[in-house]
Structures are given as structure tokens and as C-alpha cells.
């Protein structure tokens, strides 16, 4: 469905939003675009909110397009949580809505941001030093320059908290950026803690009667996230190596920055490519062989073909490192969440680094 049609739906809804969107049960309506935010709210609020996730379990998040029903769902929300600037359709749709009674929150706005870049040349054409990141060209770091700018949509309540912009260094190679910051901010447990605290604040403001409940749950959940962070730190501190290889897209930029890991990947996190060049495959195979890397990673909901091929060629074990961007229908119905999936990553990373 075209954006123009979706915008017309949003415009039609502009005058139909009531000043109180709570259901008859008195619960506030929370809408999230993707699974991480959905799970964070679920852990904090339990059944004391009406919670909806727009992205269906098992669906590809990067190609998601909202339906008219999704637009109506967003309109009915008291709090709308999305990732950030990568979801460009949201900005345009929200501008067409009456957001006077909505609180709008972007997860990217509470963490230090790093730029991500798409490069045209495969990684095998650069030297080992410059190949330390996605395709060997992505040397971007958060330098902690905070700017307290929040985004406002219509007259809604926007929570920006603060931005911290990174600087991109191309090291002499021609690079072409996708003009976005890496949106996979939740892959760092430290970032997840910041996001959970911000969401808890929003929920407490929206529903003061349940604020103590939200804050108690958040405190317990944050303690578990801190333990998760410590577990990853322990794995890295005692590892034989600090290098991981991805035969897939790479959504773990915030994660590897948090634990000072070196990574080699077929595609950047925002890449729309699905088939790597022969040169990229050859480079990754050579890297695994020369450094005797025992594991080649793929991400969730991947076709795994490239990981299969590289595993067969090198003898490296194929393993899933779950970014928790989305979950399968089976995992969703089983109630698996961020903590469970990331705890699996702890042991998988231990295997890969030893």
C-alpha cells in the first residue's frame, strides 16, 4: 500500500481521536513497532497495560510497511514506542495525525549513537587493519557529545532525553553512508537498561496509580540486565580472541562497541543486499582460516545460506547470534524474551571466542 493512501487514513483519523484512549478496563494503550520495545514494556508493566506490537512475529523488520489497521492502532495509543530515524515512515504518518494526547518515544534518543555506513567495495580489497569492522570501513564511535534535542510530532508529548552523535572515519577509503545511525541500540545490555528506565518513567507518568508496580518490576529487570552485561564482560575478559565473523547482515554494532570486539561481516546492519560478492565470501573464508576462528555467525530469521557455505568450506561451526530484532512465531508463543535470547548469546559467544 502506498504511503499516500496510508497518510489519507491517518488524516481521516485526525479528528476522530478522543481525548481519552483508555479502554473500558481503564488500562493505557501502548503500541510498539518491534519486539525489543514490546518485551521491555511487557517485563515492566505485565498485564496492567494494553500492549500491541505492529511487527508480526517472524516478519522481516526492514521491509515492514504499516497497514491501515496499523495506522488506526497507532492512533489509539497513549504511548507509541518506535526505534528512531530508521523508521522513516513513522515521521510522515505522525505528522498527519492528531497526537495531542499521545506520548511518542524513540529508543534511539536515550543512548549514545554511532553512525553506520554502507560501502560499495567488498572487504577483501582493504588491508587487515581497516577491515576490522563491517566491510572494513566502519570506524565510527560515540564521542559522547550530548545534545538535549527531542523530536515533536504535532503537539504530542515527545521524549528526546538526549542525543550523542558519533563521528565517521573512512581511513582513506571511499565510503557511501546510508545517512542513518545504527538503530539496533538494544543489542547492548547497557543500552537496554537506559531504554527500560526511560520506558518506566513514561509508564509511571501515564498511569501514576501503577507507578510503584512499574518501578518495582523495572528494578528487578534492570538487575537481571546488569547480570547479563556482567556475563558478557566475563566471557570477553577470559576469551582467547576478540574477533567474530558474520556471514550475514550485522546488527550488533552497539554490542561489539560495548565489549571492544572486532568484527567482520558480509553486510552492514542497514544493508538491503542478500547475496554477497565472491570477493566478500573469499575474504571471510580466508579470515576464518588464517585466524583459526571456530564459529561463523548468522542472525535470526536468516536463510543461513552464506553461513552454511562458509561453514562447509572452513569447518567453522555455524551458530546463531540472536539480535532480538524480531522473534519467530514459535518463540513468541513460548514467551521467550530479550533476557532468555541474550543469555543464549552469552554461551554462543563464549564458544566463538575460545
Where in the sequence are the language-model features?
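Bacterial N-terminal signal peptides
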Residues: 1-8
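Extracytoplasmic metal-acquisition and chelation regions
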Residues: 13-354
Amino acid at each position: 500500500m502506498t504511503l499516500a493512501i496510508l497518510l489519507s487514513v491517518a488524516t481521516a483519523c485526525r479528528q476522530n481521536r478522543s481525548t481519552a484512549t483508555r479502554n473500558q478496563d481503564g488500562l493505557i494503550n501502548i503500541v510498539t513497532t518491534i519486539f525489543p520495545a514490546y518485551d521491555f514494556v511487557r517485563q515492566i508493566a505485565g498485564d496492567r497495560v494494553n500492549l500491541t506490537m505492529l511487527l508480526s512475529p517472524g516478519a522481516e523488520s526492514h521491509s515492514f510497511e504499516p497497514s491501515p489497521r496499523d495506522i488506526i492502532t497507532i492512533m489509539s495509543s497513549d504511548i507509541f514506542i518506535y526505534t528512531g530515524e530508521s523508521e522513516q515512515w513513522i515521521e510522515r504518518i505522525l505528522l498527519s495525525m492528531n497526537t495531542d494526547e499521545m506520548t511518542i518515544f524513540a529508543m534511539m534518543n536515550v543512548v549514545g549513537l554511532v553512525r553506520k555506513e554502507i560501502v560499495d567495495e567488498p572487504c577483501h580489497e582493504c588491508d587487515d587493519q581497516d577491515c576490522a569492522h563491517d566491510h572494513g570501513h566502519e570506524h565510527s564511535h560515540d564521542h559522547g557529545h550530548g545534545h538535549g534535542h527531542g523530536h515533536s510530532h504535532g503537539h504530542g508529548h515527545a521524549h528526546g532525553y538526549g542525543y550523542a552523535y558519533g563521528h565517521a572515519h573512512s581511513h582513506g577509503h571511499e565510503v557511501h553512508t546510508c545517512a542513518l545511525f545504527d538503530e539496533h541500540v538494544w543489542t547492548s545490555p547497557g543500552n537496554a537498561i537506559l531504554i527500560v528506565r526511560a520506558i518506566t518513567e513514561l509508564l509511571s507518568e501515564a498511569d501514576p496509580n501503577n507507578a510503584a508496580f512499574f518501578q518495582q518490576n523495572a528494578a528487578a529487570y534492570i538487575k537481571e540486565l546488569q547480570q547479563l552485561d556482567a556475563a558478557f564482560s566475563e566471557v570477553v575478559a577470559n576469551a582467547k580472541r576478540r574477533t567474530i565473523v558474520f556471514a550475514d547482515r550485522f546488527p550488533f554494532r552497539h554490542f561489539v562497541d560495548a565489549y571492544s570486539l572486532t568484527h567482520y561481516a558480509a553486510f552492514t546492519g542497514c544493508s538491503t543486499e542478500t547475496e554477497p560478492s565472491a570477493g566478500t565470501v573469499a575474504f571471510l573464508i580466508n579470515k576464518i582460516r588464517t585466524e583459526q576462528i571456530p564459529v561463523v555467525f548468522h542472525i535470526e530469521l536468516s536463510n543461513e545460506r552464506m553461513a552454511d557455505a562458509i561453514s562447509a568450506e572452513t569447518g567453522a561451526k555455524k551458530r546463531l547470534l540472536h539480535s532480538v530484532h524480531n522473534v519467530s512465531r514459535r518463540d513468541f508463543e513460548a514467551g521467550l524474551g530479550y533476557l532468555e535470547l541474550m543469555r543464549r548469546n552469552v554461551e554462543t559467544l563464549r564458544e566463538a571466542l575460545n
